[in-house]
Amino acid sequence: MAMGTRYAGKVVIVTGGGRGIGAGIVRAFVESGAQVVICDKDEARGRAVERELPGTVFLLCDVTREEDVRTLVSETIRRFGRLDCIVNNAGYHPPPQWPEETSAQGFRQLLELNLLGTYTLTKLALPHLRKSRGNVINISSLVGAIGQSQAVPYVATKGAVTAMTKALALDESQYGVRVNCISPGNIWTPLWEELAASTPDPTATIREGTLAQPLGRMGQPAEVAAAAVFLASEATFCTGTELLVTGGAELGYGRKAGQAAPAEAPTTPS
């Protein structure tokens, strides 16, 4: 693997780094010269990435457990003596469900992972990031801004991640710490494939996901990863930003009502 210098000598923690977007982010930072700590609660996946990529260290960690996260940060500092960037990528998108099918317990569990896991690592990492004038990168989602059918809990958690990013950026600017987020659209990952498989017609679901972008394809984890390295390195005048990596899925003006919705003709005001 060719090693770059864009982020040489820096130390990065990536949560959910065992597969999908997270693994892509780990790879991109390694290629940029950084030392990367892979955080994942799935040991087999994390170890596989560690074996593949020299310059990485895997630490077993469930971001919903604060003691795990404390150990993650302290062990990173013990091994490397510094911390320059955290990428809060760990998260989950449940299968489609209507609001009446959701439970308060399921909603809380998703909040613990998608939102509070991000908050906990950020809080515990900030003393070290302030020393290095480092940065925080949160992985949010396009649907946190534009909504998504049958995904109320997920949309709520990701909208909160984006809002938290902006608030943290204000608080941490006095220490020179930059806080930004990336909001991906449809990125082809194992999780996307699993979600499609849970629908009545996976092939049709994948086709719809592909055609949602004007570019006519889904994104790749490497494209989100490139955005993360950019925010950590060259984007030195960016904080509180939401960087969309969506293939333009949010663009345009089109049909929203379903087939069964009555098509009412507009009336002219009297």
Curated annotation (Swiss-Prot):
InterPro entries recorded:
NAD(P)-bd_dom_sf, Sc_DH/Rdtase_CS, SDR_fam
Subcellular localization is given as: Cytoplasm
Provide a GO biological process annotation.
steroid catabolic process
Q: Where does NAD(+) bind?
A: 19, 21, 40-41, 62-63, 89, 154, 158, 187, 189, 191
A Pfam family that the UniProt record links to this protein: adh_short_C2
EC number per UniProt? 1.1.1.122
Pathway-wise, it operates in: Carbohydrate degradation; L-fucose degradation
Q: Which GO terms describe its molecular function?
A: D-threo-aldose 1-dehydrogenase activity; estradiol 17-beta-dehydrogenase [NAD(P)+] activity
Catalytic site positions: 154
Q: Does the keyword Oxidoreductase apply?
A: yes
**Stored PROSITE patterns:** ADH_SHORT
Class of enzymatic activity (EC top level): oxidoreductase
Q: Which residues form the signal peptide?
A: none
Catalysed transformations (reactions)? L-fucose + NAD(+) = L-fucono-1,5-lactone + NADH + H(+); D-arabinose + NAD(+) = D-arabinono-1,5-lactone + NADH + H(+); L-galactose + NAD(+) = L-galactono-1,5-lactone + NADH + H(+)
Any one GO CC term of this protein is:
cytosol
Per the record, the domain of life is: Eukaryota
Describe tissue expression.
Answer: Detected in retina.
Keywords, ordered alphabetically: Carbohydrate metabolism, Cytoplasm, Fucose metabolism, Lipid metabolism, NAD, Oxidoreductase, Steroid metabolism
Describe its assembly.
Answer: Homotetramer.
User: What does the record give as the function of this protein?
Assistant: Catalyzes the NAD(+)-dependent oxidation of L-fucose, yielding L-fucono-1,5-lactone, which rapidly converts spontaneously to L-fucone-1,4-lactone. Can also act on D-arabinose and L-galactose, with lower catalytic efficiency. Does not use NADPH. May be the initial enzyme of the putative L-fucose degradation pathway in mammals.
Please give the family membership noted in the entry: Belongs to the short-chain dehydrogenases/reductases (SDR) family.
Name of the molecule in the record: L-fucose dehydrogenase
Q: Which organism is it from?
A: Bos taurus
